[in-house]
Swiss-Prot record:
Transmembrane segments: 20-42, 62-84, 91-109, 113-132
Gene symbol of the encoding locus: ywoB
Protein location: Cell membrane
Lineage: Bacteria, Bacillati, Bacillota, Bacilli, Bacillales
Keyword line: Cell membrane, Membrane, Transmembrane, Transmembrane helix
Gene Ontology cellular component terms for the protein in this record: plasma membrane
Membrane topology value: Multi-pass membrane protein
Entry protein name: Uncharacterized protein YwoB
Amino acid sequence: MMNKGGRLRKAVRKSIPATFRLFLAFNFFVYGLAKVVIGQFGEVTPEIEAAAGKGFTIAWTFFGYSHVYELFIGFGEILAAVLLLIPRTAALGAVIFMPIIVNIVLINYCFDIGVQDLSTILMVMCLILLWMDRRKFMGIFRQEPIDSRQVMKR
């Protein structure tokens, strides 16, 4: 019979990744839809072209210049969100999510976008998910085969 501490650890070990996956998926789905459906960055106006000096204005104008880039990032966020919601594909979703969120964190800090806290939290959550699934990725770095039963456990 499992003691209370063992049950609690097991529950936490399962609930934290699930909670992180849902939180990341929700945030990326919302931001992805904002880019794909309404255009998060906006269009370049004469006023914005004349403005200089504000990092946020310059960055948003730059990203808004290319609708293709906005759609690419938006669809990437939506794909990562959907994959994070499905337990069998959650690790792949985290892998897709990671370069996107690292880029977002750098942009937020370098251009003072103002949502540094949220983007940093999302990145740390993704890192934790990747760390918890590290056994799934070990085969990439090893020569010997990995037992699939151990990888798919969880």
